[in-house]
């Protein structure tokens, strides 16, 4: 049994070992029609629920008689247990839990236990060493991120009842340095109005909403089949630890009954002395205005037909950046996350640069030409912290909706990429956003190795260069590639698994190829978006390959492939390359983030060696440094 299998087995068993056995008198299971009723006397803090990921969702309710009681969806174990999740039982002397869609002979009902504690000790081989992850459960979009009183608040889409998407809450973690995160209790929980989808948070410095100067106000989407997607508000007066939902929710409904209407981004627009909100409305972004964060008026729309097509817009952000560092020349940047729309399939982040006059946002470049914030396949739902002064700090979710639910992980699913600081530059008369790794990341460098300059027309192998680093390291260097050749590095282990990062001067591309990076077969289970399937069928009817396959390098499946970015975004003949490797990811930054590229990888043994290579001529590598990274 390899290390991955051992840890998976440990996790499956851990839920039973960590739970305190309950006597038959403590837990009684009965049936009333289609409902399983679990009556508990002397309840502990948690009922421990066994999960089997491939099964349909059961519906679980802590029944207190309150109108606020909310059903949660849990893939309860039928034949085997993949892992367990805790289900809070409240503070009463007894507890009643109701379950729908479960057979009386299901394994989960035979193995119900209770515990006053829940272990969050890591049991997953692929948990990153320096990227943010939830201790357990599912995480996707970062949302509601705000900086206040020395703390960065990271809220995120979170399912505490399984490692697949569902039961959307706002999870919560805080940090003083963007790297060391302390996990707190979920800040906003799914309720009877629906799932708590993405949104944003602001510091209400002038008490416009009436909850006190400095209250944190969250705007989010409540989503359900009954109510559709509606915008709601909650407020916090304890520095973002807990939120109270506004009694007048929802604060905004789509005026045309639109189904896909979500992810509100709120910002203060000083010239109008008012709050503005952008909501993703399927194929466009809609602007609204408010004086009190409660009553909103429609202003304008933006983006229909723009950028990569076909697509669906989600998770907007709207920030101001100085052009080439000149604070007297500011432009607005609209971040628009699209799913589908990625060059290589699935989800990605594009952006538009322009001007805003309090009513309309107008692009200054051709809006029909897509611009990508990151050219990897695992960079999505990128939004920025609010209230950070002159700094614009973005945080992407590090996955792709095509396969996010089937990655080879159990205890948790979902990690955030490294924080990036955004800047705006011009090249050839056009505006571009650079997304460079935030300087706070340098603080986790532990050891430094310096490698002598390399000049080669073949390869120089540095076997064991990152030995003992547990697959968590950074390598940076300057490279001058052969004029029409290829220069790069091969990051590998002794299992023959490797990720290639190289500059192809003939094609003028920066490339990351993970075709042979480790576990990749799960990519065959990838599920393209319906919009993507329709576009694929249209191309195939004309004898063309699907766009994502045509764009990718060495396509094997929707995970096993290479991604690329145009080197035309950079300047000069020498490039600065910075590569961050963690247990399940490789992130590339070229020339200060003019090119960023983020991809997941799942090597079965940590990468510990690096080969520098050149093809088609002699290339020069200099200023080579390798850093061990860790918390």
Residue spans of the language-model regions?
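Beta-propeller domains
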Residues: 57-59, 63-65, 133, 149-150, ...
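Structural motif
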Residues: 59, 106-108, 167-169, 227-233, ...
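Hydrophobic core segments of beta-strands in well-ordered, beta-rich domains
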Residues: 49, 97-98, 141-161, 183-187, ...
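Beta-rich accessory regions
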Residues: 26-50, 55-66, 89, 96-101, ...
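Bacterial Sec-dependent N-terminal signal peptides
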Residues: 1-26
